[in-house]
């Protein structure tokens, strides 16, 4: 299987709860699929938005607002509409269907 470029923009566990972010990263780890996780929030004593990252994400994804629902996922530079679409794409790329559909 060729190496796919998987990017996830989301809220890290140390900052707040994002069930979608957690399920996506857990699935990718179970699949042993390399991915990059971009933290849109940081906690260096106080919680802060990474505004430049969020602005670049909005532009890249074609969003008209910075009010973004996370996670936002790209596979090979193609934005995944939702987690269902993300899972379908993984299956079409040859990742283990049994793990994905569990």
Curated annotation (Swiss-Prot):
Originating organism: Enterobacteria phage T4 (Bacteriophage T4)
InterPro entries: Thioredoxin-like_sf (IPR036249)
Protein name from the UniProt record: Uncharacterized 11.8 kDa protein in Gp55-nrdG intergenic region
Superkingdom per UniProt: Viruses
Gene3D superfamilies recorded: Glutaredoxin
